[in-house]
Amino acid sequence: MNGTVTVLDKGAVRIHSYMSPADTFHTTTQLIETPARVIAVDAQLLPAYADEAIAYAKGLGKPIDRLIVTHAHPDHYNGAARFGVPVHALAQVTEQIIARGDSRLPTGEVIPLSEFTPSVAVIPGTEVIDGVTFVFEAVSGGEAADELLIKLPEQGVLIAQDLVYNDVHLYLGNNDITGWQQAVDALAAESGYDTVLAGHGLPTGPEVYADVRRYLTDARELLGDDGDAYKKAIVDKYPAHVGPFIIDIANRSLFPAGN
């Protein structure tokens, strides 16, 4: 396995957090193991890494019940077809995925839209799955236009995905630092959650919110009108962070004339 898996025992639930290697900026697929099934959250940029997460999940000896895609960025849905189960997403996220169209891998290979279009709408609210309470909330603004936040209140777990990165450079291509700061503030105001699952990086705890806030504050200060200068400045500020290529991807949106 090229990726790594971190296992968290939460009583009736076990969390298996698959994290891709640094070449795809430590993107995560969360495998939520309930008594009789597995709920998968997000599907990787590279299908090969999705295959690793799926092979691990199958080793648990329980069927994968569904795949939930949290937002409309390809590093979270390109591998969706590999799971072979219904793909769930917020209606607005599905619309955004459709608007993006076919996905092109770094190799040039094209993944047709039909392979990853969600087919089941996630309705915000509470759903009990295999005896486990899941709370689904829609969050607007920040890292993406819309994101799904998943809470497991009985286990004290927040599946924040790309609302939170852990020691990985932040993708700012949505050009909404203020919205992201507000989303993180809302997460930080939650009580009773000691485990936070990040969309990039290892599982963490509430202490990650201060880290994300600090990075966003620094990014706002360092962002000017030159993408290369911003990248150098933020990498110098956070030399240990993984995934500086994320900055290049974001800069194409932030500075389209110069990239």
Each model region followed by its residue ranges:
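Accessory terminal helices/loops
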Residues: 2, 189-191, 202-259
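Conserved beta-strand hairpin/beta-sheet module of binuclear metal-dependent hydrolase folds
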Residues: 5-55, 149-162
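Short Gly/Pro-enriched turn/cap motifs at secondary-structure boundaries
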Residues: 20-22, 117-119, 138-141
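Divalent metal-coordination and catalytic microenvironments
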Residues: 32, 42, 57, 71, ...
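Loop/turn elements at helix/coil->beta-strand transitions in domains of secreted/extracellular proteins
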Residues: 36-37, 62-65, 86, 132-133, ...
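Short catalytic-loop micro-motif centered on adjacent basic/acidic residues
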Residues: 39-42, 66-68, 135-136
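Metallo-beta-lactamase
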Residues: 45-47, 133-214, 218
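Active-site HxH/HxHxD metal-binding segment of metal-dependent hydrolases
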Residues: 55-126
